[in-house]
Regions:
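The feature marks the mature, well-folded catalytic cores of soluble enzymes
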Residues: 2-277, 283-333
Length: 333
């Protein structure tokens, strides 16, 4: 019997809510949001942000209210102004465009995404063809692809591996987007190794710790839940993967922006709901869902800590220097 099952036996006549931990903000998201908040407090408006700082509309709307201006391209930023790169990273082309416009850049790229960029440059310099496992239209993949576009191909499924054409099958390396499904990525890597026996990979896996931890937590409780709800925006890759993981194990699952997205029919005949959140979803949205479900009779709330998570990332030098120069400016998240 799992931990969740044993807990459920304590409240046989009460509908249960299993609140998964870890959930919500990862270290890279906390860092990125802190960077925007500190920049706004230290420098005032306007502060431009290229793309959504993280993939959550509530976070973006909150920062917009504080004065952040989100743009799709650095070409939209007036010359000489400050611009923050999102947590998903940018290509060298974007960096060069910023330089040409004399923009004052603050880089909020997640350090784990930067790691993938560094690996791409390294493999390309060593003469390898690169296979980037990920979703072609995701901001992170677009940025990584830009490091070595001439030698990089993107694949999103095992089936796509068969159609790859490479100049030298013995000089191949793969990298992955950081927010993918562990299981699907494992299948793609297996297909690559079968097709290209000499293929090389990163020294350590590219899928980030938070993506992995949240997927492991979902797997841990999926069999004990009648329904899984994932708080996260539709453009959040890691949030969508959590839904897919649950469904692959036979547990109905839905992605919700907030409690207003919950449909009453989902809760019919449901005794146990599991609740988690993607890595860019604020905790207050989770608590609003908890309150909503309590009103629907899910009053037995049990928080299950599947594993500890205490990762923190340092701030970029330009932000550290700002805090040092103005002690009143502090990290808020």
């Amino acid at each position: 019997m799992s931990e969740a099952s044993s807990l459920r036996t304590k409240s046989l006549h009460t509908k249960s809510l299993l609140l998964l931990k870890p959930r919500g903000f990862c270290a890279g998201v906390v860092r990125a949001i802190d960077i925007v908040r500190i920049a706004l407090e230290a420098f005032g408006r306007p502060i431009y942000v290229r793309k959504e700082i993280v993939h959550n509309r509530f976070v973006v709307e909150e920062l917009q209210q504080k004065g952040a201006i989100f743009v799709d391209s650095v070409d939209e930023v007036p010359e000489g102004e400050r611009v923050i790169y999102s947590a998903h990273g940018v290509s060298p082309e974007v960096r060069e465009a910023s330089k040409m416009r004399k923009l004052r850049v603050i880089d909020a790229t997640c350090p784990l995404v930067t790691k993938v960029h560094v690996e791409a440059v390294k493999f390309a310099k060593e003469g390898y063809s690169l296979i980037l496992i990920g979703h072609r239209d995701h901001d992170e993949v677009i940025g990584t692809l830009g490091e070595a576009p001439a030698v990089t191909q993107v694949v999103g499924s095992p089936a796509e591996v068969a159609s790859l054409t490479l100049p030298d099958p013995s000089r191949v390396a793969y990298l992955t987007q950081t927010t993918l499904s562990l299981d699907e990525t494992r299948d793609i890597i297996a297909a690559l190794k079968k097709r290209f026996p000499d293929i090389k990979g990163p020294a350590a896996q590219d899928i980030c710790y938070a993506t992995e931890n949240r997927q492991v937590a979902v797997k841990h409780v999926a069999s004990d839940a009648d329904l899984l709800l994932v708080v996260g925006s539709d453009n959040s890759s890691n949030s969508k993967r959590l839904v897919e993981v649950a469904r692959s194990l036979g547990t109905p699952a839905h992605l919700i922006d907030d409690c207003n997205n919950i449909q009453s029919r989902w809760l019919q005949d449901v005794k146990t709901v599991a609740l988690t959140a993607g890595a860019s979803a604020p905790e207050h949205l989770v608590q609003e869902v908890v309150e909503y479900l309590a009103r629907q009779g899910f009053g037995d709330v049990q928080e299950l800590e599947i594993m500890p998570e205490n990762v923190r990332f340092g701030l970029p030098p330009e932000i550290v220097e700002t805090i040092a120069a103005a002690p009143a400016v502090a990290v808020q998240s």
